[in-house]
């Protein structure tokens, strides 16, 4: 690790995009970072992060990222509101789960890498982009969505460095 990529810009940014899809515009970001890897710390970045987001209606969502998960590519998002719960869960090769006094969750590891997890999503995104181009319509997500995700990443970086929530309202 020679240069910090900043976990919030290179990993969490995708979760910010998904959270905005679920929650709408975010008005507050509170982030925490920690290090298990000394090289990443020395480069000025975190290798693990927790981010709490709040929208204008007061709905709160939590994102947890870690550059290395021994169980595979672990990514979850859950938003609970008065009318229900929306989840984005891990994709597994099997639905068999094991739970006992020592172990819980899936009997098999999670998919190993984001390219495995999102292969279909990337293909569908490219198809939708080409379709929008051919039809002369505005693609989604838009450049405005990308800018908002980056704005959240910058707010999370500031929050993790200062230890304080950042207001975006």
Where are these regions (language model features)?
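A structural signal for well-ordered alpha-helical segments within the folded catalytic domains
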Residues: 13-20, 120-127, 144-151
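Structural signal for well-ordered, non-membrane alpha-helices
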Residues: 20, 27, 87, 130, ...
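C-terminal glycine/acidic-rich active-site capping loop/insertion
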Residues: 50, 76-144
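Short, ordered coil/turn segments that flank beta-strands lining enzyme active or ligand-binding pockets
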Residues: 56, 82, 161
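Short, mixed charged/polar active-site loops
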Residues: 58-60, 85, 165
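Glycine-rich Rossmann NAD(P)(H)-binding loop
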Residues: 64-68, 78-82, 169
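C-terminal helix-rich "cap/oligomerization" subdomain common to oxidoreductases
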Residues: 128-169
């Amino acid at each position: 690790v020679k240069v910090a990529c900043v976990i919030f810009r290179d990993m969490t940014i995708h979760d910010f995009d998904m959270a905005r899809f679920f929650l709408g515009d975010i008005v507050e970001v509170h982030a925490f970072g920690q290090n298990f890897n000394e090289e990443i710390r020395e480069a000025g970045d975190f290798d693990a992060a927790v981010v709490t987001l709040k929208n204008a209606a007061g709905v709160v969502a939590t994102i947890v990222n870690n550059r290395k998960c021994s169980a595979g590519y672990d990514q979850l998002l859950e938003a609970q509101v008065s009318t229900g719960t929306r989840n984005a869960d891990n994709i597994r090769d099997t639905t068999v789960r094991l739970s006992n006094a020592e172990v819980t969750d899936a009997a098999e590891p999670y998919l190993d890498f984001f390219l495995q997890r999102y292969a279909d999503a990337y293909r569908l995104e490219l198809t939708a982009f080409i379709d929008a181009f051919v039809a002369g319509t505005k693609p989604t997500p838009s450049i405005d969505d990308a800018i908002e995700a980056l704005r959240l990443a910058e707010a999370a970086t500031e929050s993790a460095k200062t230890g304080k929530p950042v207001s975006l309202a």
